From Swiss-Prot:
It comes from Bacillus subtilis (strain 168). Induction: Induced under high-osmolarity growth conditions. Has two osmoregulated and tightly spaced promoters. The first promoter is sigma A-dependent and the second promoter is controlled by the general stress transcription factor sigma B. InterPro entries: Na/Glc_symporter_sf (IPR038377), Na/Pro_symporter (IPR011851), Na/solute_symporter (IPR001734), Na/solute_symporter_CS (IPR018212), Sodium:Solute_Symporter (IPR050277). One of its GO terms (biological process) is proline transport. This is Osmoregulated proline transporter OpuE. GO terms for cellular component: plasma membrane. The chain crosses the membrane at residues 3-23, 40-60, 62-82, 125-145, 161-181, 190-210, 224-244, 271-291, 314-334, 365-385, 394-414, 424-444, 449-469. Disulfide bonds: none annotated. Disruption phenotype: Disruption of the gene eliminates the osmotically stimulated proline transport activity and practically abolishes the ability to use proline as an osmoprotectant. GO terms for molecular function: L-proline transmembrane transporter activity; proline:sodium symporter activity; sodium ion binding. Catalyzes the uptake of extracellular proline under high-osmolarity growth conditions. Essential for the use of proline present in the environment as an osmoprotectant.
Amino acid sequence: MSIEIIISLGIYFIAMLLIGWYAFKKTTDINDYMLGGRGLGPFVTALSAGAADMSGWMLMGVPGAMFATGLSTLWLALGLTIGAYSNYLLLAPRLRAYTEAADDAITIPDFFDKRFQHSSSLLKIVSALIIMIFFTLYTSSGMVSGGRLFESAFGADYKLGLFLTTAVVVLYTLFGGFLAVSLTDFVQGAIMFAALVLVPIVAFTHVGGVAPTFHEIDAVNPHLLDIFKGASVISIISYLAWGLGYYGQPHIIVRFMAIKDIKDLKPARRIGMSWMIITVLGSVLTGLIGVAYAHKFGVAVKDPEMIFIIFSKILFHPLITGFLLSAILAAIMSSISSQLLVTASAVTEDLYRSFFRRKASDKELVMIGRLSVLVIAVIAVLLSLNPNSTILDLVGYAWAGFGSAFGPAILLSLYWKRMNEWGALAAMIVGAATVLIWITTGLAKSTGVYEIIPGFILSMIAGIIVSMITKRPAKASYRLFGVMEKLLKRKK
């Protein structure tokens, strides 16, 4: 690793730690630590939600898929873009209004508890446990990505990369809480944006423009330029269904709960979707132009997911290379920090305060939150020590698991007055169980149907049927629904 790359990465790591220190000085109570005091503006909300969402797949996974399979990968990008937009449009305003009306709910399990008027502690326990289990695995996957990045891009030891990435993320998350996570995600989102604009443009000019690029791709495999080639109706529907997962991702939708004002959601949506469309387009073009570049200049690409890293090393000065590689770290670290904090909030707010210390002071809760971040990080690191550990295979299904378990339950809670706690509990259990059964029985592979499709549909049906056959929600729950709708109309 050259000294220039070390300097670039050093500047990046120091900047993240300084932001954590700034947030630490601003954090005084549990609301600050978990939701930043509900003071996020539209720019920070939009970019932090995007950065928390995208992880390393944006700079490695999507370019790699485009390089290997061509334009058929666009169906996945389209599904995710539509899902993100509908999340801003359908879920964000009502969730922000409801959490404010519901005595400032600060976590998803806390929202469910207050939405249904503390009617069943089981609902809070189940939702908190789902978050803890899936996100601990999810976090370990991000840590593995960090270790592998150092190993493949810098020739460094896997464990060194793992520990370095984890140490920086844990420090700023542990001390700065939600504000640190959101501000670092904002900066990391900006870095990702710049990298995914710069790399494909420079690579494109090296290939020679539009005609030479298409000529080189056609020479490799003309089917790479056919969006329908190799994509059956089932696979297209499955790709598009990825968008359903957005409704149930706690680390993304918590940003909507933390925004300063409901009115800020509209500009946040415009900023967030502009960011996403440009970065997804840059990611797609990086992979596609990579095919042309590799063929024209005889570059050997053993692993398609390395194409962004290859471009970063070949086309740029080492100082810029360090900056571009820090964009991958930014994508990885932004997701790890968000997942760590959401998991810690489930431990602190939804288990510790709810069942052990109802009258705990803010100082005590912040301390428990910080300890939770540390403990969860240690567990995730232990799972990550072996990058080929089979337990990490489950992480790829977490998106479908969260989307199916929480998505229908949250949407029904926000739009249907008759929804009760037993319906929400049934939706969570059926959604999560369907995804697990679909995967473990081999139905996902044999049918080609992405597990979120049966999971989401059956979860929605279970939520409606169980709510209808069990007792109506308390009158206070109906009143709260009315307060939410009035607040929503007043703030629009």
